[in-house]
Amino acid sequence: MKKLNAPPVYLLAMFIAGLTTKLVFTTHIIYRVQLVGMDALQLVLAGTALEIAVFLFEVPTGIVADIYSRRLSTLLGFFITGIALGIEGLAPLFSLVVLSQALLGFGFTFISGAFSAWITDEVGVRRVGELFLRGRQLTLLGSLAGIPIGVMLAESALALPFILGGLIRVTFGIFLFLFMPETGFTPIPKAARTGWKTVFVTFSEGVAVVRKSSLLLTFALIALFVGLYSEAWDRLAQAHLLEIFVFPAIGGLELDPIAWFGLLNTAFIVFSLASNEIAKRLVDTARSQRILRALESVYATMVLAIFIFAVSGSFYLSIAVMILFDAVRSVSFPLTEAWLNQQIKSNVRATVLSMAGQLDAFGEIAGGPALGAVGRWFSTQTALIMSALILSPAAPLYRRIQRLSGKEKA
């Protein structure tokens, strides 16, 4: 069967990723808090199960992708993550939530690194930055489509979004098997593969790339801080809204939390689409210095937004800075991906990208339970303030990379 061109497949995959993610996770906090009965610590521990799986398997799956096939790694990832989503919807049990999250993290490692490396090799380093931004926009459009579907399903049964989201991902894995090309990647020839020795050689080459680059070493520190802060925000921000505020009526119309979170997620996507379009127009993604300056501003804004969200006693101000945070954070992903791919040789690209993901996962494993415990024993507000403080070094570190890149080829 004839394969499709790489860019349309990449963009469709990003759309499906956004669709299924928002379909499932628009109302997942309500499912976990109200149906499963999870508290702040359990919410974070579920995320920690995911991050432990990512930490354990991120680099091994990246190495396998560099040795054998990025295409195979990606389609396996869609199959496994689809199964994982379906598991959580089987019954409202904390044990199933943890199992689902661990399997989701395992499946994610097959996509992380490999998918980005695949499209970079297919279209080239200079073209891929703009494609990452377009891909992010397609993810957001998919998310926009997923929100009303998820809300409607959740109104009938809170478990239904998990089941449908999982089925869509598994089906898309079959589509990738049939139509996803792989023409830009050259695997290690079978005759040159020597079992575990090939794995260790690929890993060693990836480590050497990072160790020889002061830019990548500094970025590794940023990845750690990003991991340390993010679990508190991802798991506790919406729970903080439920804990602190009574959700108001709009124009005399009473809305339950499900409807409110649907509206909020729609706003997140609309503003994120706008921020990505602005970045696409203003940031020259072929020039690393431009990307770095943008990332410095993005992370400074994120820190400020988290702090204001945590201390605000106003529902509408909290919503406004939450939307701002989500919009600028959305830009950080494709810009980081574009810059990082510019620094890495093709033969170890998936491995090094997976190392960055592993550092992020390690940060989430270390920071998540600690901040979750703070949220349980003190307050979600305290946990979120600590999260902002943890992220605060990121912007100065991006400034440092800008200075270093004048001495080291970027």
What residue ranges belong to the model's regions?
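Juxtamembrane intracellular "pre-TM" segments in multi-pass secondary transporters
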Residues: 1-4, 181-221
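Helix-loop boundary and gating motifs at the non-cytosolic
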Residues: 2-55, 215-257, 261-265
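C-terminal transmembrane bundle of multi-pass solute transporters/carriers
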Residues: 7-13, 45-49, 55-59, 66, ...
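Conserved MFS/SLC helix-loop-helix module at the cytosolic interface between two early adjacent transmembrane helices
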Residues: 54-92
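C-terminal ends and interior cores of transmembrane alpha-helices
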Residues: 79-93, 300-313
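Cytoplasmic helix-loop-helix junction between adjacent transmembrane helices
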Residues: 102-140
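Symmetry-related core transmembrane helices of the 12-TM Major Facilitator Superfamily/SLC fold
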Residues: 160-178, 384-399
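Helix-loop junctions on the cytosolic side of multi-pass membrane transporters
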Residues: 165, 173-192, 399-410
